[in-house]
Amino acid sequence: MAGTHTLHVATRKGLFTIRREGRGWQIGEPDFLGDNVSAVLSDPRDGALYAALDHGHFGPKLHRRAPGAEGWEEVMTPAFPPKPDGVEDVDPMSRRPIPWTVMRIWCLEAGPRNRPGELWCGTIPGGLFQSHDAGRKWELIRSLWDNPGRKQWFGCGGDFPGIHSICLDQRDGRKIAVAVSSGGIWTTEDRGATWACRGKGMRTSLVPPERAHDPGIQAVHLL
């Protein structure tokens, strides 16, 4: 949603903008026609628009359209650091090695109003990234990536786990919550210095019964 009269819809066939005109809605010319748009963000702070593309074999791309601009510019795509030698990182269900490579940008979120240019990004595999300059540079939040609880996350509907929801508390910028499929809900109250898994009371049917209530492996779909 971009304002009260405009919708931006990301689809496998492009990015569609739908505007309210009179008593009806009008679909404009699509952007990135024929491309898989995996995420879209309309920044409520300045009106910039961000679109993440999933090019399959050729990898993800991220584009930004400045407020009032006609065209798009490609900005930096988040990237993992090289995987250290000797580190074992596998999906606990499939036993497949988890690549330290961004396969898909799954969600984008704007930072607080008092921090212009701050963006957050969730990826497959389950990385959380932050940018301070409108997507020109990205930093992996190592405190979550290196958390021992991440080793329990597994792919649900995809080959690998991923972060699909990021919620920032606009009243307190230190508080952030992210949701993982499948890996539960994780929250921080110190801007990512430390994380806690929140999911007591949830239940999943994707694992053996004795682990159904484990908060760290819940198949959260949206937050």
Task: Please report, for each region that a protein language model flagged, where it lies by residue.
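Extracellular glycan-interacting surfaces
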Residues: 1-223
